Amino acid sequence: MRKLLNEELGRPTLDEYAESKKLPVVAVLDNVRSAQNIGSFFRTADAFGIEHIALCGISSTPPNREIHKTALGAELSVAWSYYPTTLECIEKLRSEGYQIIAIEQIEGSTMLDKFVADKNQKYALIFGNEVDGVDQAVADIVDGAIEIPQVGIKHSLNVSVSAGVVMWEMFRQLI
């Protein structure tokens, strides 16, 4: 088998991508501290057509060298905004009709393999801090939670890995 060359991949231009239909999904970063993790969010959101990234609290924002290092330019193709707090972001997204879903190990969470996305619903997926996860004040006001099934002793994934798993599943179900 031969690997495809970049020019054979049929990649859209930045303008074509900007005009393309996106999934009705916003990735909300609740105080994600690593700029490299944030860059990975941008790259993954670009790959799966996520409409927006909301950077909250201590989360770094573009332009940032560390974000660019992992985003590889996807910070230019994915729309983003900054909010001083995740609670402010949630309030705005809820007022716009988004269902607020924490990606977290929470009582009553739905395992990702059991989650069924509604194609008529808009989703705001809350991804938490690398150490503390989704803040409890945020968890207290979400509409639901999705948990990624795991079998190892850590029961913990890097936040950008979690984003890849969940964004892929949303893409698979909503495309």
PLM-predicted stretches and their roles:
Residues M1-I175:
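Post-transcriptional modification and biogenesis factors for structured RNAs
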